[in-house]
C-alpha cells in the first residue's frame, strides 16, 4: 500500500555573489585617449575591426550586421561588467562611435 506524498522536497536556496564591476571609463569619456577618439570619430569601421581583433575575434566580424553588439556583450561578460544586452543595444544604437571608443579603452586597459 502506498502512502500519498504530503511534503515535497525543498530546493536549496543559495545566494550567488557576483564580482561585477563597472566599465573603466564612461561612454562619453572619449577624450581620455585621443587616438581612440579620433579613430572612433573619423573611421569607426576601422575601430570596430580593431576592437573585434583585440577581443580575440576575426577583424572582419564587424562586417556582419549586429556582430558588434555581440562583441560588446562578450566584453561585459568576460570582465563581469554590469549591464544587459538591452543596454548594450541602446548604447550602440544611439551612441555608436562613443560606445566603440569605450570598448576600445576597456580592452586596452584590461589587456
From Swiss-Prot:
Matching InterPro entries: PLAC_motif_containing
A Pfam short name: PLAC8
Similarity comment: family membership: Belongs to the cornifelin family.
Signal peptide: none
The species this protein was found in: Xenopus laevis (African clawed frog)
Domain of life: Eukaryota
Family matches, as PANTHER family: DUF614 FAMILY PROTEIN-RELATED (PTHR15907)
Name the record gives this protein: Cornifelin homolog A
Amino acid at each position: 500500500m502506498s502512502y500519498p506524498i504530503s511534503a515535497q522536497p525543498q530546493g536549496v536556496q543559495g545566494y550567488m555573489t557576483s564580482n561585477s564591476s563597472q566599465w573603466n571609463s564612461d561612454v562619453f569619456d572619449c577624450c581620455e585617449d585621443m587616438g581612440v577618439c579620433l579613430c572612433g570619430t573619423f573611421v569607426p569601421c576601422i575601430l570596430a575591426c580593431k576592437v573585434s581583433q583585440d577581443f580575440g575575434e576575426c577583424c572582419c566580424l564587424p562586417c556582419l550586421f549586429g556582430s558588434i553588439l555581440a562583441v560588446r556583450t562578450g566584453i561585459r561578460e568576460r570582465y563581469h561588467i554590469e549591464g544587459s544586452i538591452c543596454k548594450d543595444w541602446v548604447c550602440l544604437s544611439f551612441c555608436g562611435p562613443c560606445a566603440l571608443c569605450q570598448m576600445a579603452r576597456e580592452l586596452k586597459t584590461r589587456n
